[in-house]
Design a protein with these regions (language model features):
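Structural alpha-helical scaffold elements that stabilize or flank donor/cofactor-binding regions
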Residues: 111-112, 131
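Short acidic active-site motifs
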Residues: 82-83, 106-108, 127
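Short beta->alpha connector loops at strand-helix junctions that form conserved
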Residues: 10, 36-37, 122, 139-146
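Residues that form or flank phosphate/diphosphate-binding pockets in enzymes
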Residues: 16-17, 105, 126, 147-150
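Structured adenosyl-cofactor binding patch, chiefly the S-adenosyl-L-methionine
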Residues: 129-168
C-alpha cells in the first residue's frame, strides 16, 4: 500500500533549493507542491510578478530542477493556512513537518496510511511556529555527526525517501 505525498514549501529563500526540491519531488512521485510565503516559484499563468523577475526566478529554479518545474503540479499561496486548507480539500489529511524540535519523532518511526502534506521551511529558521502548532506530527531526521542541520533540499530528499518507503 502506498500513500500520496504533497509538499508545502514555506519561506524558502533559495531558487536553487526550490529547484532541487522539485527534482527530488519528481523522483519520489510527489503529487503536488504548495508554495507559500516568499518562496520563489516557477512561472505561472497570469503571473503577477514583474515579467523580467518571474523569468529570472524561473530560470534559476530550472537550473537545478532539470525539468521537474514543468512536471509537478503546483499552486501558490501567500499564507500557509491557505495552502494547508487547499491540500486538505485535495484529500491530504495528515499534515506533518520536518523540523528539529523537542516534540519531534524520528522519521523512521513515523507511520501513517493517510495521504500527507509534508511542510519544510526556511533555510535558517526552519518551519514556522504556525506549522509546528498545527502539524499532526513533527518529524526529524536522525543525525550523528557534529553538524546539527541539513540543507533543506537534502533534508527534503531524505524525508521523501523515508516516507515513500513506509509502505514499499
Amino acid at each position: 500500500m502506498s500513500i500520496n505525498i504533497s509538499l508545502l514549501l514555506h519561506d524558502i529563500r533559495s531558487t536553487q533549493n526550490v529547484g532541487s526540491i522539485m527534482r527530488s519531488a519528481d523522483c519520489f512521485g510527489v503529487k503536488h507542491i504548495y508554495f507559500s510565503g516568499y518562496t520563489p516559484y516557477p512561472l505561472i499563468q497570469n503571473d503577477t510578478r514583474l515579467p523580467h523577475l518571474a523569468k529570472k526566478i524561473n530560470s534559476r529554479i530550472a537550473k537545478t530542477a532539470l525539468g521537474a518545474e514543468t512536471s509537478i503540479p503546483f499552486s501558490v499561496y501567500n499564507y500557509e493556512p491557505d495552502a494547508v486548507s487547499a491540500a486538505n480539500k485535495a484529500g491530504f489529511k495528515q499534515f506533518v513537518c520536518l523540523e528539529q524540535d523537542p516534540a519531534s519523532i524520528p522519521i523512521n518511526k513515523y507511520n501513517t496510511n493517510l495521504d500527507l502534506l509534508l511542510a519544510v521551511g526556511n533555510e535558517l529558521n526552519g518551519v514556522s511556529f504556525w506549522t509546528r502548532q498545527n502539524a499532526h506530527a513533527i518529524l526529524e531526521i536522525a543525525q550523528f555527526g557534529k553538524k546539527e542541520s541539513l540543507n533543506v533540499s537534502n533534508a527534503t530528499a531524505i524525508a521523501l525517501y523515508a516516507l515513500t518507503n513506509m509502505h514499499p
